[in-house]
Amino acid sequence: MSSWNPGSPAGLPATQPATQPSGPTAAYDALLKQHVDARGMVDYRALHRSPKSLKRYVDGLAAVDLDALPRDGKLATLINAYNAFTLQLIVEHWPVDSIMDIPEDKRWEHRRWDLGGRKYSLNEIEHQVIRKRFDEPRIHFVLVCAAVGCPPLRREAYVDDRLDAQLADQTRYVHDHETWYRFDRRRGVLHLTKLYDWYAGDFEQAAGSVWKYVAPRVDGVETAGPKPDIRWIDYDWRLNDVNNGPEG
C-alpha cells in the first residue's frame, strides 16, 4: 500500500515550499488538523464541543467572491465549502450514526448554505456548480459526504497552487485502499467504489470508459490478462467518525 500524507503537499518536489493557507482558510486548515485523524476520519464529538471555529468559517463563505478567484482557487474554495458545510450539518444533528439518519429534507437538497451571497443545497454545489463548470473527475475523490464510503477527509484545506497535487494524492490513496478498490487477480474481478458507478459519465468523458480511467492508476491491472469484470463495492454509509472507518 502506498503512503498517503493528508497533511502535506504530496506530489510536490521536496525543494518546493508549501504555500500556507491564509485568512479564513487558515483557520479551517487548523480545524482540520485538530479534528481529523490520519485515516481521514473526523472527531465529531470534539467538533461538537467546540463548534465556533467551524461555524465562523462556514458563515464567512457568504462573503467569498468566487468570480474574483482563478480557476484552481475557485475549485479549491468550492471543495472546502462543500466539505465544511457537510461537517456543519453533522455537528448540528449530532449525535448521529450516519448522515442518512438526518431527515431527507435537511440533508442534500436543503438550500441553506450561503456561498458568495447565494443560497445553495449541497447537491447544487456538487452537481450544478462543481461538476457542471469544471472538467475534473478527481473531485469525486475529494468531496466528502460524511460517510466511511466517501473519500477520506484531508487534514488540510485545499489551496489553489497545490490543488493538482492534492487531487493526485487523494486519487492515489483511493486506488490503493480496499474500502474503494480491490483487485482479485485470480478470478479476474475488479471491485470498485460505487462512485465509479454513480458518476460513470464523468470518468467516461475523461478517459472513454471507467476501465480506461482506472487501469493506469493501479498497479498490475493492465498486465494481469483480459479486462476484468467490474463489480461495485457496497457503499458504507456509516458516519466517517474516528470510531468508524478503515484501519490506517
Language-model features, listed with the residues they occupy:
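Interaction/scaffold regions that mediate signaling and macromolecular assembly across diverse proteins
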Residues: 2-248
